[in-house]
Regions:
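Short helix-coil-helix linker/hinge
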Residues: 29-36, 95, 118-122
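Canonical helix-turn-helix DNA-binding module
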Residues: 47-90, 96
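N-terminal helix-turn-helix DNA-binding core of bacterial DNA-binding proteins
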Residues: 22-61
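A cross-family signal for key residues in well-ordered alpha-helices
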Residues: 38-41, 56, 74, 79, ...
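Residue cluster at the C-terminal edge of the helix-turn-helix DNA-binding motif
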Residues: 3, 74-79, 119, 138
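N-terminal leader segment of winged-helix/HTH proteins
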Residues: 1-30
Length: 141
């Protein structure tokens, strides 16, 4: 097998990621992006959190978190609550509407996962995840 160029590798990864995201988000009943779903999921896990916590945990810039959270607030998926002791601090909490869209996303995500990744054996899937984590760890060093 001929060694692929860095451009071919990046293009291949990008095509897989983009196609996966489009197929997955197109199946949702509401128009919501994958980044918004990831942020919603993290807010749900934490119950309440500050924007800076989300940025650090998810590896997003502060401005990206601001843009995503503004969309989520407008869609009534999260609320922003000011800290009564320090007005500069705000906390996000997930709303009932946010829980509903996240539940739908999780159900569709599981179906998508079972469909797309069914072409891989359990061993191949474990290797794929291991390789992705290894590369991500190395890139972040």
């Amino acid at each position: 097998m001929e060694k692929p160029s860095i451009y071919e590798l990046i293009n291949m990864v990008e095509q897989v990621n983009n196609a996966s995201i489009v197929q997955y988000t197109d199946s949702l009943s509401k128009s919501i992006g994958i980044s918004s779903i990831i942020v919603l999921s993290e807010i749900k896990k934490r119950k309440t959190c500050q924007p800076i916590e989300l940025a650090k945990k998810l590896g997003y810039s502060k401005s990206s978190i601001t843009a995503i959270s503004n969309k989520l607030i407008r869609a009534s998926y999260i609320t922003s609550i000011a800290d009564p002791h320090d007005r500069r601090k705000t906390y996000f909490t997930i709303t009932t509407e946010g829980m509903d869209i996240l539940k739908e996303a999780e159900i569709l995500g599981q179906k998508y996962y079972e469909t797309i990744y069914s072409v891989l054996t359990e061993e191949e899937l474990a290797q794929y995840v291991h390789i992705q984590r290894k590369l991500l760890y190395y890139i972040k060093q």
